[in-house]
C-alpha cells in the first residue's frame, strides 16, 4: 500500500499547509504514541514509553513541538524535550537513553517556511516501513484521549547538548587532537549552531564559527552545506586550514580546503574508504547512489573495493550497507554513513572522520583524493505538479533516448522525482561539460513541455 504521508525522509511540507499543520501534527503525535505504546516492549511490562523530541531553529518548531507533545501525552506517552539539536544527536540520545523513539522537527536543508517530522526507532535508526504504515493506519482512527491518570508527562532534557558533544568527540581518535588547525565551521543558522563549534574547539581547533545566529527565519539562507560559497569566502578571508559546512539539521556536510576548493560527499567517501584501507588493510565494499559520480565508482573498483548504487536517499544507502554488511556509504549531497561510528548520517562525526584521515596521513584533502577527477555533471531541478505523469511522456522519453544515443556509453542520464518536494531532477554526466549541459538542458526542456 502506498504511503500517504511519509516520504523518503519523514513527513515534510510547507508550514500551514497539509500535512504540516498543528492539527495534523497533534494527530500524528497521538497516532505514533498509540503505535509505540502498543509495542511488545511496553505492553508486556506495563511501563510507559518515553519519546525524545528535538528540533532545528525554524520559528514553526515551537508550534509543532507543542502539537507533538500534546499528541503523545494524549496517547499516554511521556515526552523529553531536547530543544534545538542536530538530527543525528536525537538518534544518538534515543539509543543512549534507551527511549522508545526519537522525533525530529526539521525540514533539513529546506527554507524556513518548510518544516517536517521524522522519527527514529529505539536503536537510533529510521523507522521501518511497516511501523510508518502502522502510524498511517492509526491516523485514520479517532483521537481518544487517555484517562487523566494515564496521560503522558513532559520534561526538558537539560544536558542534551553536552551528552551529544561528548559522543561526537568520542568518535575522534584519542591519539590525535586538532591543535594548530584553523577551522571555519558553518552551522547554517541551524540545529548545530551551539554544539558544533564546541566539538571542534574542545578537540583543540581554532574555530571560526559562521551561521550561528538563528532568528527563526534565516536557517539555510545563504549559508550552510547547500550554499557553500559563504564557507569558501570565510576560509579565504581568515586564511583557514579547512572549512566545514553543515545543513540545517546537521546530518550532511561539505568541506572546503585552504585553497577554497569544495569537496562533496562522493569525494569524501573515496577519501574515507582509502583511509580505512590504510588503517585496516581492506574494505570489502562501499555504497553510493544513482547520483554518485562515475569517477568515484571507477577509482574505488581500481582500489579493489566493490561499489553498489542505492536509490537516492540516505535511508536507501543504509539499507544497502546493512544488506551487504558494509560500513561506509554516502550521497554526493554530503550525507555520509559510517555505521561503526553512528547509526545515521552525522555531519559533525563525518567531519571528524575526514580530519582524522588528514591527521593520520599528514596529507591535504587534494593529496588524499589522489588525482581522482570527477566527470562533469549537470543537474537541473524542474518544478512540476505533484500529480504530473512524467513517466508516461513520449516527449521526455525521446529526449532521454537522444541524449543516451549521443553519449554512447561515455556518460549517464538519470531522471528521478524528489522524495521531499514536487521536483523532477534531471542529471546528465559526460566526459566534458558542454555535453553534460547540452543534454541536461534539452531533457529539462522536454520535462517542462510535458508537465506544463
From Swiss-Prot:
Q: Which InterPro entries match?
A: A-D-PHexomutase_a/b/a-I, A-D-PHexomutase_a/b/a-I/II/III, A-D-PHexomutase_a/b/a-II, A-D-PHexomutase_a/b/a-III, A-D-PHexomutase_C, A-D-PHexomutase_C_sf, A-D-PHexomutase_CS, Alpha-D-phosphohexomutase_SF
GO cellular component labels: cytosol
Record PTM text: Activated by phosphorylation.
Residue positions binding Mg(2+): 108, 247, 249, 251
Q: Which UniProt keywords apply?
A: Isomerase, Magnesium, Metal-binding, Phosphoprotein
HAMAP family tied to this protein: GlmM_B
Protein's UniProt name: Phosphoglucosamine mutase
Species this chain originates from: Paraburkholderia xenovorans (strain LB400)
Amino acid at each position: 500500500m502506498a504511503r500517504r504521508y511519509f516520504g523518503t525522509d519523514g513527513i515534510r511540507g510547507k508550514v500551514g499547509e497539509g500535512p504540516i499543520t498543528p492539527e495534523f501534527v497533534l494527530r500524528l503525535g497521538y497516532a505514533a504514541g498509540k503505535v509505540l505504546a502498543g509495542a511488545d516492549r511496553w505492553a508486556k511490562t506495563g511501563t510507559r514509553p518515553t519519546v525524545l523530541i528535538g528540533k532545528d531553529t525554524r520559528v514553526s518548531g515551537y508550534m509543532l513541538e507543542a502539537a507533538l507533545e500534546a499528541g503523545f501525552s494524549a496517547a499516554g506517552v511521556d515526552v523529553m524535550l531536547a530543544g534545538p539539536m542536530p538530527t543525528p544527536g536525537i538518534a544518538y540520545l534515543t539509543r543512549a537513553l534507551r527511549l522508545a523513539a526519537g522525533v525530529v522537527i526539521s525540514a533539513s536543508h529546506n527554507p524556513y517556511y518548510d518544516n517536517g517530522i521524522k522519527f527514529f526507532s529505539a536503536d537510533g535508526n529510521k523507522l521501518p516501513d511497516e511501523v510508518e504504515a502502522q502510524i498511517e493506519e492509526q491516523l485514520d482512527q479517532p483521537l481518544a484521549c487517555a484517562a487523566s491518570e494515564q496521560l503522558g508527562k513532559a520534561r526538558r532534557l537539560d544536558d542534551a547538548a553536552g551528552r551529544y558533544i561528548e559522543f561526537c568527540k568520542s568518535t575522534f581518535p584519542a591519539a590525535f587532537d586538532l591543535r594548530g588547525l584553523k577551522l571555519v565551521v558553518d552551522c547554517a543558522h541551524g540545529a548545530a549552531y551551539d554544539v558544533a563549534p564546541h566539538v571542534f574547539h574542545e578537540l583543540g581547533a581554532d574555530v571560526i564559527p559562521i551561521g550561528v545566529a538563528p532568528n527563526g527565519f534565516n536557517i539555510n539562507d545563504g549559508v550552510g552545506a547547500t550554499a557553500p560559497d559563504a564557507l569558501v569566502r570565510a576560509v579565504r578571508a581568515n586564511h583557514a586550514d579547512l572549512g566545514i559546512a553543515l545543513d540545517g539539521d546537521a546530518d550532511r556536510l561539505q568541506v572546503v580546503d585552504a585553497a577554497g576548493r569544495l569537496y562533496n560527499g562522493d569525494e569524501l567517501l573515496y577519501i574515507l574508504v582509502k583511509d580505512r584501507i590504510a588503517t585496516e588493510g581492506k574494505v570489502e565494499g562501499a555504497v553510493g547512489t544513482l547520483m554518485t559520480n562515475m569517477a568515484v565508482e571507477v577509482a574505488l573498483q581500481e582500489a579493489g573495493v566493490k561499489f553498489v548504487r542505492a536509490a537516492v536517499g540516505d535511508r536507501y544507502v543504509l539499507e544497502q550497507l546493512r544488506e551487504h554488511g558494509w560500513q561506509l556509504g554516502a550521497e554526493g549531497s554530503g550525507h555520509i554513513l559510517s555505521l561503526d561510528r553512528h547509526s545515521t548520517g552525522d555531519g559533525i562525526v563525518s567531519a571528524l572522520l575526514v580530519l582524522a584521515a588528514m591527521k593520520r596521513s599528514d596529507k591535504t584533502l587534494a593529496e588524499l583524493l589522489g588525482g581522482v577527477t570527477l566527470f562533469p555533471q549537470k543537474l537541473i531541478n524542474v518544478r512540476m505538479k505533484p500529480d504530473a505523469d512524467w513517466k508516461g511522456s513520449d516527449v521526455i522519453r525521446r529526449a532521454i533516448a537522444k541524449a543516451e544515443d549521443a553519449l554512447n556509453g561515455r556518460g549517464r542520464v538519470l531522471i528521478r522525482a524528489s522524495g521531499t518536494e514536487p521536483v523532477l531532477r534531471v542529471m546528465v554526466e559526460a566526459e566534458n561539460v558542454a555535453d553534460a549541459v547540452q543534454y541536461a538542458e534539452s531533457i529539462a526542456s522536454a520535462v517542462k513541455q510535458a508537465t506544463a
